[in-house]
Amino acid sequence: MGRELDVPVAIAPATPDLARVASRVAIPVLAQHVDPVDAGPRTGFVPPEAIRASGVWGSLVNHSEHPLPPTEVRSAVERLHALELVAVVCAGDVDVARKLAATRPAYLAVEPPELIGGKRAVSTARPEVVSGAVAAVREVSPGTRVLCGAGVHDRTDVRKALELGASGVLVASAVTLAADPRAAIEELLTGFV
């Protein structure tokens, strides 16, 4: 769908599905989480080498549902970079976005935790968070693209995020909980055209 509208799209399936999905789709695949640990005796941890072996493009880091201390975020991003994988770092507010931008991720998604999974998009409920994060990230890491997450459900939310300076959006529940996920994706994509 994204190709038809010339909109880049990536997907972040559950960890057990990474290799299967990565081998079957033509779009970038992201892990939902990675731990900054070496491969070896690390029960329950997800080392960057493991996701790389799955054929993924990169990983989310520090999602509000799986936060890491700032030092671990930095280590995770460094490990991903060393393996030539993309880091999509998540931040809950402008101050955290500014601090984590120093890790120089390819993308930084700003998602206030209280709006994740809700019906109100951060781009409309708290637009200053999006515009503030865009300004802060550009100041610290001009090459990092800012994504807008939390409550993004439709083309209006996407357009507002782009107007505020975001390069794209990060969504989950708008698609995974939709009665018709394909229609939900199409609705979101039309916000880019």
Locations of the language-model features?
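Conserved N-terminal beta1-alpha1 strand-loop-helix module at the mouth
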Residues: 1-46, 87, 95-105, 177, ...
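Hydrophobic faces of well-ordered beta-strands that scaffold small-molecule active sites
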Residues: 9-13, 29-32, 59-61, 87-89, ...
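Glycine/small-residue-rich loop that forms an oxyanion/phosphate-binding "nest" at active or ligand-binding sites
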Residues: 26-82
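Glycine-rich beta-to-alpha transition loops that act as phosphate-gripper elements at the mouths
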Residues: 33-36, 40-43, 69-71, 90-95, ...
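Glycine/Thr-rich beta-alpha phosphate-binding loop at enzyme active sites
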Residues: 35-38, 43-44, 109-134, 144, ...
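Glycine-rich phosphate-binding active-site loops on the catalytic face of alpha/beta enzymes
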Residues: 57-68, 107-120, 162-185
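C-terminal helical cap(s) of enzyme catalytic domains, especially alpha/beta-barrels
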Residues: 76-82, 122-128, 162, 173-193
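Catalytic cores of alpha/beta
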Residues: 91-104, 141, 148-169
